Amino acid sequence: MTAPLNHSAPITVEVALGDRGYDIVIGRDVLRSLGTRIAALRPGARTAIVTDRNVATCWLAQTQAALDDVGIVSMPIVVEGGEGSKSYAGLQQVCEALIAAKIERNDLVIALGGGVVGDLAGFAASIVRRGLDFVQVPTSLLAQVDSSVGGKTGINSPHGKNLVGAFHQPVLVIADTAVLDTLSPRQFRAGYAEVAKYGALGDEAFFAWLEANHAEIVRGGSAREHAIATSCRAKAAIVARDERETGERALLNLGHTFGHALEAATGFSERLFHGEGVAVGMVLAAQFSAERGMLSNDAAARLSHHLAEVGLPTRLQDIAGFAQEGLADADALMALMAQDKKVKRGRLTFILLEAIGRAVIAHDVEPEPVRDFLARKLADKT
């Protein structure tokens, strides 16, 4: 990826949760301030840095240096990269390492990595010694705009994604936009799907801005920081109103009911990154909304066109290996969606669209129209 165009002073977004509220600090090179911010937040604390091998190569030394500069002790806990670490075995590894390192309740866990590391480290922090505070240092675009904010932590089960976990808010989020320069184009695009999601579900003006500025976001600088800050503000506002996802927060799952099933169907593998699953899932949700008469075909096409223009998959046939390996059939995908966290009394709940910028929660969706819709999309050869 090319060098950033320009950059400005850090942006701070507040997650307003009373005495459990925290700041998201966004900007280029803000990782350098990690030590001073932690020292002010938790004087005398030791830290354990949970990261994966790939991130450790690029950013562990710099993170430890920022802590060393103010005399903060840090101990690295390195897991394998990829969704496979977000498992019972990965959780056991991190928990046992935290206990062995004698990390106490006045110390801090630092999650240095993408969504997998953040979810895993946050969940481990929530259960070791009945709760350790933790700091999110997200190193992927997806993690900076989504998974590091709002306190959802957890691991996957063989039955599905994110089925074991807890709500556990961080005490600080440091979103350094410079670290995104080390992402592959595919990783960056996958994170962009979550950025586009915020426009699609609740802010048409932001979506239009993304349509006009997505190339500048890729290049970096102030457009990238604006996109991240706008996304974080949108999520922070919803989390402040509905922390435990009893209502409005479910809107943030636009694209995720279909997307999570597709991730499970591809074995949580590199065939389909999470953000890519969300992209395909959002388009499917929009098309299903149009079939139900809720959304215009033009609006569904607008969403699909923008995601495709960025380089994201928008059709089931775009999933890597579809032609060679195929995908689960409609019945198998329905079975995977039946494990979705939004299912109530066995009935499916979908996040659908009435317009670009207006999502709604659709309860008690009949399964047969969904199964028929998926069967047609799987058979689509266009």
Curated annotation (Swiss-Prot):
Binds 1 divalent metal cation per subunit. Can use either Co(2+) or Zn(2+). It is found in: Cytoplasm. Its EC number is 4.2.3.4. Pathway: Metabolic intermediate biosynthesis; chorismate biosynthesis; chorismate from D-erythrose 4-phosphate and phosphoenolpyruvate: step 2/7. NAD(+) binds at G115, V116, V117, G118, D119, T139, S140, K152, K161. InterPro entries: Dehydroquinate_synthase, DHQ_synth_AroB, DHQ_synth_fam, DHQS/DOIS_N, DHQS_C. One of its GO terms (molecular function) is nucleotide binding. Its cofactor is Co(2+); Zn(2+); NAD(+). Keywords: Amino-acid biosynthesis, Aromatic amino acid biosynthesis, Cobalt, Cytoplasm, Lyase, Metal-binding, NAD, Nucleotide-binding, Zinc. The keyword Zinc applies. One of its GO terms (cellular component) is cytoplasm. It holds the Pfam family DHQS_C. Zn(2+) binds at E194, H256, H274. One of its GO terms (biological process) is amino acid biosynthetic process. CDD domains: DHQS. It catalyses: 7-phospho-2-dehydro-3-deoxy-D-arabino-heptonate = 3-dehydroquinate + phosphate. Its main location: cytoplasm. Catalyzes the conversion of 3-deoxy-D-arabino-heptulosonate 7-phosphate (DAHP) to dehydroquinate (DHQ). Belongs to the sugar phosphate cyclases superfamily. Dehydroquinate synthase family. PANTHER family: 3-DEHYDROQUINATE SYNTHASE (PTHR43622), 3-DEHYDROQUINATE SYNTHASE, CHLOROPLASTIC (PTHR43622:SF7). HAMAP family: DHQ_synthase. This is 3-dehydroquinate synthase. It comes from Rhodopseudomonas palustris (strain BisB18).
